[in-house]
Amino acid sequence: MQWETVIGLEIHAQLSTQSKIFSGSATTFGAEPNTQASLVDLGMPGTLPVLNAEAVRMACKFGLAIDAEIAEKNVFARKNYFYPDLPKGYQTSQMDHPIVGKGHLDITLEDGSTRRIGITRAHLEEDAGKSLHEDFHGMSGIDLNRAGTPLLEIVSEPDIRSAKEAVAYVKAIHALVRYLGICDGNMAEGSLRCDCNVSVRPKGQAEFGTRAEIKNVNSFRFIEKAINHEVQRQIELIEDGGKVVQETRLYDPNKDETRSMRSKEEANDYRYFPCPDLLPVVIEQSFLDEVRASLPELPGQKRERFEREFGLSTYDASVLSASREMADYFEQVNATCGDAKLAANWVMGELSSLLNKEGLDIEQSPVTAEQLGGMILRIKDDTISGKIAKMVFEAMAAGEGSADEIIEKKGLKQVTDSGAIEAMLDEVLAANAEQVEQYRASDEAKRGKMFGFFVGQAMKASKGKANPGQVNQLLKKKLEG
């Protein structure tokens, strides 16, 4: 039997406000445990919450960016459950009146195709604290610094059909919230966390299968692995005559498996009711107009512009627009060198490879955009070849100066004098007279393979400095003359 995977994602984005959603406590990551938890965060008797206006603004920004309707009237609700790191015994969230209604987001897949994923809603809520296990023997500690940190929970429609699509969607959300400046997207620190709702059904069946929810997956790689494992588990279970149970599961990256945590709760298990301490929030059109005017060029808009203005492929444009910093860097390189395709190749190739190897973000690049653009200019005017350019790039990354300084200091200027190249080629051919005879006696197919040998010898003789185009042209003329 052929199976179809059905996936819906719930993404929790920590909003980049300076203070918590209902108190003035700081939201700085990494502070000493329980040093950023106020009486309001702890739910002490007599304390009252005050809504953070900046959190509302950030939620509206997101809603406008996904073309969603922003609710004029917002109501906060209490979600009641017990957990050690939930000091009040309830979480202040939104249920029937979320701030952001239905919207959508277009994602780009690896083959360059695009898919539209529906977004059911996005609502504001407060984060819980954190349980600590490492420093306690036989016990758990509780750090309430995170309690009350503003979250935007983004709930997708069950439109996703594979683990790769799920990763593409999370990457698109990650890029969007960073472009908007509402979340830093740091998954390692828990700023962006993902719950994956996964089910399978026979291909062609309209009715959904029973879903399992995989909680708090915190990396793109783990999202793909967790979903693939859960899909395989469910298919094998059904084909063996079993039934999928609706439950919450946890992904263990060390064992590459999901395991059961608890039975999955329904909304009525949480006994939602309107929060009596918070009045309904009314959002006026003038406020939305102000927020809309502050929106930057969004990732999808930037990708389309890169394709339209610079003639880049959908894939290249998607990679370069994935982060605001990467897009800005690429545009600065292009502004310096005036060749978008060469700029794209170097940013996506050598530069990205260097950053990955050194574990750096683009903002920490040892090669500035102006330096890289200047080096590409030297390729364009034939001062250096592409091969020599890689040596120049490495030297720039090591802090040895600009491209021009390195070329001058190391004597890397390309040989373009046709007379000098011809003399060098004559020496190469004389030293390989036997291969020359074989070449001239061969058919076209063999000649093509042998030609690369002569080019290699010529570039070796010139220490990579001879202009490759001229070498190819003059070599062909001499071999066939």
From Swiss-Prot:
Domain of life of the native organism: Bacteria
Gene3D superfamilies named in the record: 1.10.10.410, GatB domain, N-terminal subdomain
GO molecular function, one term: glutaminyl-tRNA synthase (glutamine-hydrolyzing) activity
Pfam family membership, one: GatB_N
Enzyme Commission designation: 6.3.5.-
Reactions listed under catalytic activity: L-glutamyl-tRNA(Gln) + L-glutamine + ATP + H2O = L-glutaminyl-tRNA(Gln) + L-glutamate + ADP + phosphate + H(+); L-aspartyl-tRNA(Asn) + L-glutamine + ATP + H2O = L-asparaginyl-tRNA(Asn) + L-glutamate + ADP + phosphate + 2 H(+)
One GO term of the biological process aspect: glutaminyl-tRNAGln biosynthesis via transamidation
Enzyme class: ligase
Keywords: ATP-binding, Ligase, Nucleotide-binding, Protein biosynthesis
Function per UniProt: Allows the formation of correctly charged Asn-tRNA(Asn) or Gln-tRNA(Gln) through the transamidation of misacylated Asp-tRNA(Asn) or Glu-tRNA(Gln) in organisms which lack either or both of asparaginyl-tRNA or glutaminyl-tRNA synthetases. The reaction takes place in the presence of glutamine and ATP through an activated phospho-Asp-tRNA(Asn) or phospho-Glu-tRNA(Gln).
Assembly and interaction partners: Heterotrimer of A, B and C subunits.
Family assignment from sequence similarity: Belongs to the GatB/GatE family. GatB subfamily.
NCBIfam families, per database record: gatB, PRK05477.1-2, PRK05477.1-4, PRK05477.1-5
Identification of the protein by name: Aspartyl/glutamyl-tRNA(Asn/Gln) amidotransferase subunit B
Source species: Stutzerimonas stutzeri (strain A1501) (Pseudomonas stutzeri)
